[in-house]
């Protein structure tokens, strides 16, 4: 029975989320806090599954990891979300109206089609942003996320604030979409991302693993060597990796970077400044040597 439950719990959870947003009262849909609460409850539910069917003892959630990860979850859903809205979504929406851009075809599409379109739109953009972060100076913003030394349902929110802002950007505001469909898509993506980071032993149907990112695929992305991380970039929709040739089968048990050094919150925040700080320190050393 337990094996059956953990085989189907991922697709069933996604189905329940979609059903919730289909029947949710208009007053709930109009309140942006509904998606925050729904996503938080989804992550909490998935996190609780670790106590029933743990995947790796070495990834077991302890008090320090819990409070650290909770801090990032709150940061991402409040401060970062607000910044994305004010600095990206609202200006993009204003530009859309100023240019007279309309997409009636999306607005009049069936609810589930709007959800699927929004999921793909967000994930495809995140895929390329994530991939760029592994191939350019942007690695300094993303590397802190790879310094995590264990995985759990909340780990998807852990990272440098600049990275969290960048990966939250999308062009959804350019399209006319039902608000409930957008919130549903965000809730679905949170669920899949939480499943993909969870320390839970799942055995999903093959069709689920074909479309959605699993803990196996994502743990491989968190391998300890930099070159090993350059695959399976999709946070939730692994189909993007399959389409773009970056998918790789496998699983990792040992995760982390730089000899698995765990970063504190302060170290996560200042990590992108390391090259600048190193340069300043080197110049200070040169000046001191010259003064002698």
Task: Locate each region found by the language model.
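Membrane-embedded catalytic scaffold of the fatty acid hydroxylase/desaturase
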Residues: 71-258
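N-terminal membrane topogenic signal
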Residues: 1-12
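Structural signature of hydrophobic alpha-helical transmembrane segments
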Residues: 34-44
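Cytosolic-side membrane-entry/anchor segment at the start of a transmembrane helix
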Residues: 1, 63-78
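A membrane-cytosol interface segment of integral membrane proteins
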Residues: 255-292
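Short, hydrophobic transmembrane alpha-helix segments
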Residues: 20-33
